[in-house]
Amino acid sequence: MMMEDDDDDFYDPADAVPINQAQDAPQNQSNEKSQELNEGEEQEEEIEVEEDEDDFNIITEAPPDAPPPEVPHPRHANLRAEPQRPSSADISTKSVTPTVTPKLEAATPAPASARPTAPQKPGSAYPPVQASTIDVNANPVHPSTGKPILSTDMDSDFPTEDDKPWRRPGSDISDYFNYGFDEFTWASYVLKQQELRKEVQDQKKQLDDMQNFLTMGLPPIPGAPGPAAPPGSAPPALPGMPGMPDIAPDMMQGMLASMMSQGMDPSSMDPMSFMQHAQAMMGGQGGAGAGQQQGQPGFGGQSQNSGFGGQGGGQPHMGFGGYDQRGGFGGRGRGRRW
């Protein structure tokens, strides 16, 4: 009914309104104004709330298509402040223009009279050259024992406590031992030095013996032929070591080549092992060409060193057909007894 009344108030003529309604019209208008004011205030409040919400959304949520704000950078500012580079055409035009290169003038050498000269002094005017006089390999004699230092025994040469002053309370051990040694480390050092020197001497002796044996420079053995054979004859057999027969040079070369082919180094072998290998190799080859030596009558013309079948004549301690000066005793072809 209120809506209809409102419509009537707006659209119907005034005379069509009844009297009672005409009296109530001012009151209705005042009520309507108050309602409109209330509704207007509510709408304003809603608009303010919506505006507040819109402002909040704008601040917190940026639209997805909006570009991010550019952060100022000092380098970008410097680049913007720099002048623009000229184009390639400008560069080409500038490069065409000839440039004058400055000439470098050679510096004139100073005269010899202006140069500072070193003072000319005789050699005696300078201090003498000082060189160390310490012999690092020296082995001086200890004054109290009368023995070389490396041969001094701490227990036998210093038997009592009075002879060992470094053991006394308050004594400085550096007054008696150098380079951080003490009584025990010095004794072990001396022992190691003696062992090393002995080992080095033994190795040198073995090396010298091996070199002499390989080069056949051994002194002549008593009973060996002294004078040399005349030219044109076969080379004499070289004197061997005790316990070995004389060795021809070609046989020695063959023995060395055979040892090297078996993987042995003759220069690193001691003399005893070399002799054993040489005897073993000679034992297998001794009877091969021994049948041409002069034989004895009554033994079939066999050589003195021939064994069974002319083989193994140089092998000692053979049982059947071994080395025997009677020549092949018990073997075949003894010859005919007369």
Curated annotation (Swiss-Prot):
Enumerate the Pfam families for this protein: Fip1
Q: Where is this region: Disordered?
A: 1-169, 282-338
Compartments reported by the entry: Nucleus
Query: In what ranges is there compositional bias, type Low complexity?
Result: 106-118
Indicate the principal place this protein occupies in or around the cell: nucleus
Q: Can you cite an annotated GO cellular component?
A: mRNA cleavage and polyadenylation specificity factor complex
What's one GO BP annotation on this UniProt entry?
mRNA processing
Keywords of the record: mRNA processing, Nucleus
Query: PANTHER family, alphabetically?
Result: FIP1-LIKE 1 PROTEIN (PTHR13484), PRE-MRNA 3'-END-PROCESSING FACTOR FIP1 (PTHR13484:SF0)
Role description: Pre-mRNA polyadenylation factor that directly interacts with poly(A) polymerase.
What name does the UniProt record give this protein? Pre-mRNA polyadenylation factor fip1
Protein species of origin = Aspergillus fumigatus (strain ATCC MYA-4609 / CBS 101355 / FGSC A1100 / Af293)
- Source lineage: Eukaryota, Fungi, Dikarya, Ascomycota, Pezizomycotina
